[in-house]
Amino acid sequence: MLDDREGASAGAFAVFGDNRAVPALVALIFVTAVWGVTFVQVKDAVAIYPLFAFLAVRFAIASATLAFPAAKRVRGLGRGGVAGGAFLGLLLAAGYALQTAGLERTTVSSTGFITGMYVVLTPLIALLLYRARIGLAAWGGVVLATAGLAMLSGIHAGSVTGDLLVLAAAAVYSLQIVLMERYAPRFDALAFTFVEMAAAFVGLLLVALALGDLGVPRGWTVWGALLVTGVFASALGFLVQTWAQRRTSATRTALAFSMEPVWTAFFGYTLAGDRLGALGWGGCAAIMAGIVLAEPAAAAVLVNVVASRRGSRGRSRPRR
């Protein structure tokens, strides 16, 4: 997370008022569009290729893409950084496994919006782990998103299992985000992310081997999804995100990231044929409203968690 370099009340004109920030904002929105279209590709791919094998190859490609630029930096992480990156990488693998298993059982649009609930769940995870204070906006986001989830899952009974799996994935992503705040200020971002993706690859590979699911991917449906998710959505998506976030504020970044469920719904409707009906789209709208309401609260909670942990470390280990 970045420090908010301008107030959240800057207004709509502030989003585009700084010409230097416009390319960064456009880049972030492009990344969210790529993330959105991958839901359609992954759903098609895992229909014909085993889930854990697909995810293992995806993270193998992502790790290989980042290996060269990150190789010289990994040593600088030390044992603590490598161990932390490996642990968070395994959490990442668990999140993707749950999300993809849910995607197999529900619609693309539902998966995108429910995944976005990680924003709503992040303050709750911080409350459980660090007793962080969360305001009314965060609780309002929880209420809206929960109501939206109930509406979305009420479309047809067959989607409930898939929706709950995706919700579990969102909870894992929230846990990873909160724990990441322990490491983000201390370690090189590129090297740390490489370790995360490599650990995710190893974990998913072991599961695929244990299940006997590993095989050579065949056909453009599978390979196209692997290349887009492995190279563009994961590796290059991270690099663009890192470049853009250094050139814009946390407020603009939050605005861009909130577009991911919207892109997912767009591609789900146009490419996957999602037809959710009034109740389903109403649920999506409620979840989106909850995300937008909770986003600033989630960012503030994480900033406060980092500040409090830095303060406690400073008191227990004074400078020499």
Name what the model sees in each region.
Residues V34, T38-F39, A67-T115, M151, ...:
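Specific transmembrane alpha-helical segments of multi-pass solute transporters/efflux pumps
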Residues L2-E6, L66, L88, L92, ...:
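Hydrophobic transmembrane alpha-helices of multi-pass small-molecule transport proteins
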Residues A56-V57, T111-V119, L179-V202, S234-T270:
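Helix-helix packing/entry segments at the starts of transmembrane helices
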Residues V37, Q41-D44, I48, I61-G78, ...:
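Membrane-interface helix-cap regions at the ends of transmembrane helices
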Residues T65-R75, Y118-G140, V262-G282:
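C-terminal transmembrane-helix exit sites in multi-pass transporters
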Residues V40, F52, A62-L66, T122-L124, ...:
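Transmembrane alpha-helical segments that form core, pore/gating elements
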Residues L2-G17, V22, V26, F59, ...:
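C-terminal-most transmembrane helix of multi-pass membrane proteins
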Residues A33-G36, V40, A67, G89, ...:
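Hydrophobic/small/kink-forming positions within alpha-helical transmembrane segments
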